Amino acid sequence: MNTNPCGGIVFLTLIAGRKQKEALVHALSEAGGRLINVVYGKGSVKAGYLKDMLGLIPEENKIVVTCLLAGDKTEGVFDMLVTKFHFDKPNTGIAFTIRVDKLSV
């Protein structure tokens, strides 16, 4: 039984290289992503911190993509991010979801 009043909606956030913007937005749209938003970003954390704590190397040109997604499509989207965009490899991208419990429209 689904007890989420929003019907299992999640807020997807991902960070990837700017060169992947068009392909990512198209793939998310095809996968059912709604209200897709793209913000250009530049990291400000010191490179040593990222390397020591997470094993990551910072890059200059990034995008932050957010969208709403039906919860039952989450696994498919994460699988697509791994197979098509190689998010399972270091320094390619990071993605996570947050469950939406309430939504005002």
Annotate each language-model stretch with its function.
Residues M1-V105:
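Positively charged, small/polar-rich N-terminal and surface patches that mediate targeting and assembly
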